[in-house]
């Protein structure tokens, strides 16, 4: 385990929330880069649509993109307070924030998200398919068909719906970034449904990269390890949430801010020779 005094260390207090969870109720509150991220003009006047941008990784990416010069569509389910806070940080960076609640399991809503980005912000240059649903289970017999379907519709169908709707509006040089997971390569049995969707997203990324290459649209993914977001205390038993991330080489859960740079890389000209790639940010866990 590595010593790191800049970030909260384990164990965290035992805690549990109702899904999808609220940032303000977490102990410690995640770091989204509010104080630490410094932009360098890598995304000047770009428009980015980010799902799950109200909290966690999506919030950190929204803050980073805004500080790099992008306007942001903040897509979220119903966590209004968290979404307003993200919008505040985007606007403090001098950029526009378009806040749109709704269920991305609906293809109609996904089409509306893209159309509003085009109509109200002038286009779409970056799509970040980040929102996800997960639950833990002790046995396959504990997983209902409805929960299996909800996991796939949120984690797999929605990125398909959004990529399908967005790609006709995207110019050469645009970028689609999917959030997969170390679970795509090292599935935990307790996360059977979630891990299955993340394996699907890794393959979706590779296939879509080939499909859109002739249009000049790059498609990549980021594979986080254990990251401290509202998803954790709202979907895991309290005792597991307290120890979350302790088995990594870093010895702790990652903070959302620690992933933002990977998304900036893939969204910007720094990643212009990258497509079909999966970038691991795992705290030292090896993706086999």
Task: Label every model-predicted segment.
Residues 80, 101-114, 145, 257-258:
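The beta1-alpha1 cofactor-binding region of Rossmann-like NAD(H)/NADP(H)-dependent oxidoreductases
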Residues 121, 169, 252-281, 286-287:
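C-terminal substrate-recognition "lid" of short-chain dehydrogenase/reductases
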Residues 168, 210-214, 272:
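Alpha-helical segment proximal to the catalytic Tyr-Lys
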Residues 181:
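Residue(s) in the substrate-gating loop at a strand-loop-helix junction
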